[in-house]
Amino acid sequence: MSEKILLIDGHSILNRAYYGLPNLTNWEGLHTNAVYGFLNIMTKVLEEEKPEYLAVAFDLHAPTFRHKMYDAYKGTRKPMPEELREQVPLIKEVLTAMKVAIVTMEGYEADDLLGTIAGMAEKKGIDATILSGDRDLLQLATDHVLIRIPKTKGGKTQIEDYHAKEVLETYQVTPAQIIELKSLMGDTADNIPGIPGVGEKTATKIIAAYGSIENAHEHLEEIKPNKAKESLRDHYDLAVLSKKLATIDTESPVEFSWEDARMGNLYTPEAYDYFKRLEFKNLLSRFDQQETEQKALPSWRIVEDFAEAENIWKQAEQAEQIGIAVIDGMDGVRGVAVALEDQNTVYFPVEGFQTEGVLCGHLEQLFAGDSQIGAWDVKAIRKKIEIPERKGIFDLGIGAYLLNPLKNDYTYDDVAKEYLGEQLPSQEEVFSGMKKPDPKKADNEQVAAYGAYQAYVALHGKDTLKKALQEAGMWDLFEDIEMPLVFTLDDMEKEGILVKGEELKLYGEKLEVRIRELEEKIYEEAGENFNINSPKQLGVILFEKMKMPGGKKTKTGYSTAADVLDKLAPDYPFVAAILEYRQLTKLKSTYADGLAGYIGADGRIHSTFNQTITATGRISSTEPNLQNIPVRMELGRLIRKVFVPRDGFVFLDADYSQIELRVLAHLSGDEMLIKAYREAQDIHRMTASQVFHIPFDEVTPLQRRNAKAVNFGIVYGISSFGLSQDLSITRKEAADYIEKYFATYPKIKSYLDGEVEKAKTDGYSLTMFGRRRPVPELKSSNFMQRSFGERIAMNSPIQGTAADIIKIAMIRVNQALRKENLRSRLVLQVHDELLIETAKEEVEQVSAILEREMRQAAVLSVPLEVDMHTGENWYEAK
C-alpha cells in the first residue's frame, strides 16, 4: 500500500473555522475559535487518512507573481477581521509546537506550494490528500491526488472528496478544464475577470464541447449563444489572462523536506502547553501521558483504621504545606481529604470512630497552626469549623478568579490543567453514571476520589498560583484584601439580617391592592381584559387598537420593552400605569413573596456574598440578592422597612459620597475636580455652572440634574446616545454636553483615552490596587463590541478601585468591631454602603470606627467622605 501525505491549505481552513465557530477567547483575551476549529478539522482528517507525512501551506502577506501580472488580482477581497488576523501567527506557533511542517514561499500562493508538493508526491509513488475550502484546487485532482473540501450542513462539518473521476462527474469537465472554466466565467473571490456575460452554465457547455479556450476561440463561429461568442471574440485577451491567473503553478521552486514532514507524535509537551494556554480542554485528552511527561493520576486511599488516622493527623499538624478539601453530605460533613507532600493523599469518611466532630476538631487544629494551607472555598469550610483570620491560608478559587475574572467557574481540574500541567478527571468524570454530579448521593469511592483530587490540587497548586499572582502584580491584592475579605463576608453571612415577617406580609398585601387597582384601570382604558404580562397582547392594544406612535414590529410582535414605554409614558397615562404595574408585580414576586422563603428559624435572612462573580471585583449577593432592592420608587424603597435591628439595637448606615467620581478625580489628576472636592463644593452644581456657562448661584435644579447625569455617565463611558436617552434630549445636545464637560475637565478626557490605549496594548485594565480586568472586546472587528470594550476600559479602573476601597473598609470595620469587643456587627454591604446593626450604647463608638476606617481605606488626592444615618429600620437609616 502506498504511503500518503496530507497537505493542508492553512489560510483556507483557518478562515473556514473562524466563520464556522462562535467567538472564543481564552483568559488572556486571545481569540481562539479559528485555531480551535482548524485543529479539530485537522485531527478529524488525520484520523481518517492516517498519512505518513503532513504539511501545512500558508500564504504570505506579500505580492505574488499573479499580482505582477494583474494589479487588481484579489483586489476586491475585504480585509481580514482583526480577530482572525491575530490567529494566523498563533496557529503557526501551535503547529510548530506539534512538529508539523509549515511551508511558505514569497511570490507564490499556498495553492502553488500544495500543487508542487502533490506533484512531487506522485512522482515518488506517494498518494496525496489536499484539504482546502477552495475549489480552485480541484484542478490538481488525479487518481492519486485527492481533494477534500469541508462544508457545513445542518450544523455539522461534512467533507466532499474529489479524485479526477468525481470532478468529471460533478462538473462535467476534467480537473485540468477547471482552469478553462475560470478563464471564461472568472472568479469573484480572487477578482479574476473572466469574460463579460459568461456564467458557470455557459462556460461548462463551451469547455465540455471544445476542451479549452484556445480551441473554443478557433471555433468561434460555432459558439452559442451569440452573446458568449461575441464576448469571447471581444475579450479573448481577458480569457487568456484569466487562465494564467487561475492556473496553479505545480513547478514552484519550493524547498520541501520529506523528513520534516514525516508524521511523528503531534501531542508534544510544547503543544500541551499551548493547548492549556488556549483552554482547549476537549483536545487535551489526545495527549499521551508519557510523551507529555504527564504524571500518573495522584494516588489516594481511604483511611478507616484508627491508629493510621491518628498517625496521619499528627503528621499533618507538623507539616509545613497542606492541601485540604471538605466534602458536604446530606446532613453535615461527609468526609475530609488531606494532601501532604511526603505521602499519598488520604480521605477520611465520616463513619465509625471518625465522627464529624472528630474530623472537624482535627481540621480546626490544622487551621489554628502555622502551616501553609491550600483549600477550596474557605468561606464554606468556615461555616463548619472555627478558622482564625491569619496569613498562610490560600483559597485556590479566589486565586484563580483574580488571574482570570472572566471565567464562570474555577474548578480543581481547570487549575490542574492550567497551572500544574496535569489532567485530572473532572467532577463529571468522577461522578460518571450520575445524571447530575452530586457528592451527597454518590458512593464512597467516588466521593473519596473527588475529595482527594481537590486536596491534591490545593496542595500543589497554591504555590504555582501564588507565583502567577506575584508575576501579575496581584499578590498584595490577594493577601491583603481578598483573603481577609473571606472572613468578613463569612461573619456577615452568619450574622444575617432580621426581617419582620408580619411587616413583609402586610407590604405584600399593600402591593396587591395597588396592583388590582392598576389592573382595573388598565382594562377600563383598553376597553377589554387582556394579559398585561403578554408583550404580544399589550403590543396590539398599544399600537393597533390605541394607535400610539413608535410601534416597532418584530417577528414576535411589537416591542413593549421598557425603553419603548418610557418614551410614551409622559404623554400617555395608560402607559405610565403599565410601567407601574410591571414594577409592582416584580416587587411583589421578588421581594414581598420572594424574601419570605429566605427567612430562617432565627427570623433572619442569611444572604450569600460572592467575591468571585463580577469581572470588576464588586461583591455580589445571592439567595437572596439584597443589593438590588429598588431605590427609585417610593413603594420600592418601603421594602427596607421590613429589615430591622434586634431589640436594644439600631441600624447605622454609612455610605461613601460620590466615591467613583472621587476616584476619577484622583486617577485623572484633573485640578479643577480635585479643587472642588477639597473645598467640599457641590460638584454637580459646579459642573452645571462650568458646562452651561452660568453663575454658580443661578444653576437651576434641572441643570444640576443634567450635570449630575453627565458626571456619573462619564464614569461609565456613556455615549451621546446613552446620555440623550437618560435626559430625554437630542443626541446632538447630549454630544454638546459631553464635549463641554471634557472642555471643563480636560485631564479626564486624556485619562479615559489613555486607559483605552493601555488596555488595547496590555489586553486588560488595572485598578489602583493592581486588579486586572481583561478586555478582549477591544480586539473585535465589530464596532459595537469594540465600543463596549472601550467603555469597559474606561470604567473598570474606576469601578474596580471603588470596589477595592469598600472591601478594605469592610475588612477594617469588621476587625475593629471585634478587636474592641463590641456587640455591634456589620450585616450588609450594598455597593458603596455599609449597614451596621449597632447596640444603642455603642452608636458613638461605631460611628467613629466607620468614619475612621472608611475615610482612611485609601489615600487619594481628594478626601473620601462618608454620609451616616441611624434608624429603627433600614428605610429610616438610609
Question: Where are the regions a protein language model picked out?
Answer:
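Active-site-proximal helix-loop-helix substrate-binding element of RNase H-like nuclease domains
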Residues: 154-182, 298, 334-470, 481, ...
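Conserved RNase H-like, two-metal-ion catalytic cores of nucleic-acid enzymes
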Residues: 5-6, 10, 16-55, 71-72, ...
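Short hydrophobic beta-strand that contains or immediately precedes a catalytic carboxylate
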Residues: 7-8, 130-132, 323-325, 393-394, ...
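Conserved "right-hand" nucleotidyltransferase catalytic core of DNA-directed polymerases
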Residues: 235-353, 369, 373, 378, ...
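Acidic, glycine-rich two-metal-ion catalytic cores of nucleic acid-processing enzymes
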Residues: 341, 533-698, 764-833, 848-852
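Noncatalytic, basic helical substrate-engagement surface that gates or grips nucleic-acid strands
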Residues: 2-131, 135-161, 238-241, 247-255, ...
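Non-catalytic nucleic-acid-binding/docking modules located in mid-to-C-terminal regions
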Residues: 50-55, 100, 123, 142-146, ...
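Conserved catalytic core of nucleic-acid polymerases
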Residues: 438-440, 494, 606-607, 611-614, ...
